[in-house]
Amino acid sequence: MLNKKNTFEDYITSAKFLIEKKYTYNGGIIGYGGSAGGLLMGAVVNKAPELFLGMVIQVGFLDSLTTNLDHSLPLSLGELTEFGDGKGNPDHFKYLKSYSPYHNIKQMDYPNLLLVTNLKDARVLFDEPTKFTAKLRQYKTDKNLLL
C-alpha cells in the first residue's frame, strides 16, 4: 500500500519515453483520467506539468487525504487496503499527504485544465474537483485555461 507513488512515476516515465522517441514533444501530451485515474492526473500534473499541453480530469479523486481520513464515507473503509489508513497510522498519513493532488498544488505554471464534477457520483465527492480548482486559481502562475 505504500507503493502508490510508483503509479505516478511510471506515468511520468512513460510520457518522457514518448517524448524521447519523438512520438510527441515536451508540453504536447494531453492527459485524461476520472475517479482514481483523476488522482493519477492530479498527482502527475503537480509533479511534471511541463510534460502536458492539457489535461481533462473527470470527477477526480483529488483530495485523497481528506477523504481517507473520513471513515464515515462509504468507500473510505473499503479503500484502506489500497491507500492506507491516514487516520490510524502516522506513516500512512505522511505518505498520503505526499501525493494527494489538492495538498501538493504549488505556485507554478500548469497546463490547460478541464475539471468536471458530478453531484451524484457514488465514488468521489463533488467537492474534490471544486476545491482543487479553487486552490489552483489561487496558486497557478500562468494564463492557461482552467475550466
Region annotations inferred by a language model:
Residues 1-147:
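Active-site-proximal cap/loop segments of hydrolase catalytic domains
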